[in-house]
């Protein structure tokens, strides 16, 4: 099956408009943002925000959560860098979490997140078929 770039762009724009309207209807605190052509949704603090983000998460191919300890308590203000496999950063956010959803082109990426001086990294492949969920958890020593 050949995918046409114009059709792909229309589908992405339609999805993003749906995301924007859902987010706007939910709360003013949740804001879908676009930085250097990368659309993302960051937040999830409080039950209402968490529920909203979980409801629209399927629109994003890459979904991340950040937590600590054995009980998995959510954390925020986590610096995140997503790089291509050549090491070139394609997305950076100084204060992510506790949930971060990102739209990226299909490909293989390395996601690095830092909390309390410890960096965790995970590789992920986005194939355009199914979204991917990454969970970063910093357990107590």
Give, region by region, the residue ranges found by the protein language model:
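Bacterial N-terminal signal peptides that target proteins for export
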Residues: 2-11
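Hydrophobic helical h-region of N-terminal Sec-dependent signal peptides
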Residues: 11-17
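N-terminal signal peptide c-region/cleavage motif recognized by signal peptidases
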Residues: 19-23
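Short amphipathic beta-strand segments in non-cytosolic proteins
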Residues: 79-90
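Short hydrophobic alpha-helix segments
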Residues: 93-94
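Short, surface-exposed beta-strand/beta-hairpin micro-motifs centered on an aromatic residue
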Residues: 97-103
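A short tyrosine-centered beta-strand micro-motif
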Residues: 107-113
């Amino acid at each position: 099956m050949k995918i046409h770039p114009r059709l792909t762009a229309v589908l992405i724009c339609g999805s993003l408009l749906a995301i924007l309207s859902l987010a706007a209807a939910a709360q003013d605190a949740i804001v879908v943002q676009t930085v250097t052509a990368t659309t993302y949704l960051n937040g999830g603090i409080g039950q209402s925000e968490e529920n909203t983000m979980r409801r629209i998460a399927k629109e994003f191919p890459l979904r991340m959560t950040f937590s600590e300890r054995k009980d998995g308590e959510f954390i925020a203000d986590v610096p995140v860098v997503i790089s291509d496999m050549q090491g070139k950063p394609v997305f950076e956010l100084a204060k992510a979490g506790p949930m971060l959803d990102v739209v990226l082109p299909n490909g293989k990426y390395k996601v690095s997140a830092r909390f309390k001086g410890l960096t965790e990294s995970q590789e992920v492949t986005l194939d355009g078929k199914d979204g991917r969920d990454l969970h970063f958890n910093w357990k107590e020593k």
